[in-house]
Amino acid sequence: MRAGKHVVLYVEDDADYQDMVREILEAADFEMVAASSAEEGIRAWDTEKPDLVIVDLMMEEVDAGTSLITDLRARGCDVPIYMLSSVGDDLAMSMDYGALGLAGVFQKPIDGRSLITILKARLD
């Protein structure tokens, strides 16, 4: 938390989607730190220490999101991590949340109200 706002690290390679999620989060009084790749996400985690992380499943590689989550957990990241995916419900059904340490999966296109409701419930 910084200046009374929860800090969310959002790792997403689509700039338009980053902008959209930033608008949703900032309207709900969150602060968003954006990273455009898994590598940037690691650096942002190391410097920002956010309260929560949202990771896009498919970035520069098909499973870059799952690799990033594994790397973050190995670095001691103990905050809730959510995955964002456009793959569909098959992913949600096949994903081993326990193995990845995920708090959940959001589907694209994301519903802003649901996102905020879930994040606030998790952080407050």
Task: Label every PLM stretch briefly.
Residues 11-12, 35, 53:
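Conserved sequence signature across two-component system core domains
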Residues 1-9, 74, 107, 111-124:
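Non-catalytic signal-transmission and effector/linker regions of two-component phosphorelay proteins
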Residues 14-33, 100:
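Two-component/phosphorelay signaling modules centered on CheY-like receiver
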Residues 46-48, 71-78, 100:
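Conserved phosphotransfer cores of two-component systems
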